[in-house]
């Protein structure tokens, strides 16, 4: 297959975005990654994002500071006065929601896409993320429309920017199984919202990751 288009992948350092990165390598010509430091308690994930970008051999890895998200109160990911919950995600936006986070992240990635003339932005949102308003299909399609309406590259009639969301209809286990097929080094990923080393194993993110990997590698002895 002749790879023509490029992509910039939102890379947190976690399992889902790592699989997205490895998948993107099979589809796109040049792959860029972008990660964000926004006052998250689990900022250690950025070290994993750096390592994953190096292993994947990306064209360039950008790390962007988004300090104002730390000023927002009410999210357990950034507010030191709130505990990271251990229960599974509820049917409504959980306390780990950072308002407008993915919209902000996509907008910043779109700025890089405009400058570097990158036609695709990859984000690893999936079905288990549905309680988060900015992890749904309607969000992705709306964000794509706004980005294209704002793009200098599009205004110059060079290319449109597409939001690449291949995991929307997939479960965490589906993503892990795809990652296994692609040879993703899961041991180089980090998915604990508490930011501890080793991971706490108690928060919803840790437990969902563990369950997905257990189901994926149930036929092995390791």
Curated annotation (Swiss-Prot):
Textual note on the cofactor: Binds 1 zinc ion per subunit.
Q: Which UniProt keywords apply?
A: ATP-binding, Ligase, Metal-binding, Nucleotide-binding, Queuosine biosynthesis, Zinc
What biological processes does GO assign it? Answer: queuosine biosynthetic process
Q: Name one GO molecular function term.
A: zinc ion binding
The UniProt function text for this chain reads: Catalyzes the ATP-dependent conversion of 7-carboxy-7-deazaguanine (CDG) to 7-cyano-7-deazaguanine (preQ(0)).
Which HAMAP family does UniProt cross-reference here? QueC (MF_01633)
The protein here is known as 7-cyano-7-deazaguanine synthase
Q: Specify the species.
A: Sulfurihydrogenibium sp. (strain YO3AOP1)
């Amino acid at each position: 297959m002749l790879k023509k288009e490029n992509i910039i992948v939102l890379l947190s350092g976690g399992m889902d975005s790592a699989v997205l990165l490895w998948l993107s390598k099979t589809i796109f010509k040049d792959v860029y990654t972008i990660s964000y430091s926004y006052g998250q308690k689990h900022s250690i994930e950025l070290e994993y994002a750096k390592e994953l970008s190096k292993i994947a051999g990306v064209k360039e890895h950008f790390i962007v500071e988004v300090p104002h998200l730390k000023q927002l109160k009410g999210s357990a990911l950034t507010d030191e006065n709130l505990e990271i919950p251990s229960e599974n995600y509820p049917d409504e936006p959980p306390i780990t929601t950072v308002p407008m986070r993915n919209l902000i992240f996509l907008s910043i990635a779109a700025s890089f896409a405009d400058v570097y003339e990158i036609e695709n932005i990859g984000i690893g949102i999936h079905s288990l993320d549905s309680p988060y308003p900015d992890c749904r299909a309607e969000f992705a399609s709306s964000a794509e429309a706004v980005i294209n309406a704002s793009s200098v590259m599009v205004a110059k009639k060079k290319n449109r920017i597409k939001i690449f969301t291949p995991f929307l209809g997939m479960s965490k286990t589906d993503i892990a199984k795809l990652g296994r097929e692609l040879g993703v080094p899961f041991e180089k990923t980090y998915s604990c919202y508490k930011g501890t080393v080793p991971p706490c194993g108690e928060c919803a993110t840790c437990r969902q990751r563990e369950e997905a990997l257990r189901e994926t590698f149930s036929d092995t002895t390791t």
